[in-house]
Amino acid sequence: MPTRLAALGAAVLFAVAGCSSPADESATIVTPPSPAEDLAELPAASAGGACILWDYDFIEQNLGVRFAVAAADQVDDTSTCVVQTLSAPWPDLALSVVETTKANATIFLDTRMPEKATKLTGLGKAGYRMNTKASGEHGPTVEIGWLSEAKQLQTLRFTFAKDATAADVKDMNAKLLELAKALSTTNG
């Protein structure tokens, strides 16, 4: 009896491992991947980098968009974080933080503010907002950059999906500014 069970176990193992004859296709076992909804959502902060500064609930409360995956990096004194949904490459939201700078408000606006940006008030020592049109496969972007009270350079950039409307962009201008203000504390 144990010999028969061992032989049966070996036959099943060889069949699953692809050692069956080509004519025996029914012996192949295929396990479909789990749907994305079944995956456990890791906190954004678990990605490290600038992701430690926020979580998905905080972002959703400010922007009305639910993100579920985060990636981060740190090079020298610059930390970054990008969050996305599971369903598509856009929208996405990126945050970059340069830990410290010698720039003052004038230097920031003269050298860090993009040419087509609009100066913002009420955000750190100096700030700007820039909207760009859709490009490539993604939609328009809203970018807010500022020099924080703690002398950090911070940038938020929301990239829309291709189908975003002008009203979506206008609405995101206000929401992204509120998120920037929530991130811009006296300590950072």
Regions found by a protein language model. Give the residues of each.
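A small/polar (G/S/T-enriched), proline-flanked helix-loop surface module common
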Residues: 22-188
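Bacterial N-terminal signal peptides that target proteins for export
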Residues: 1-8
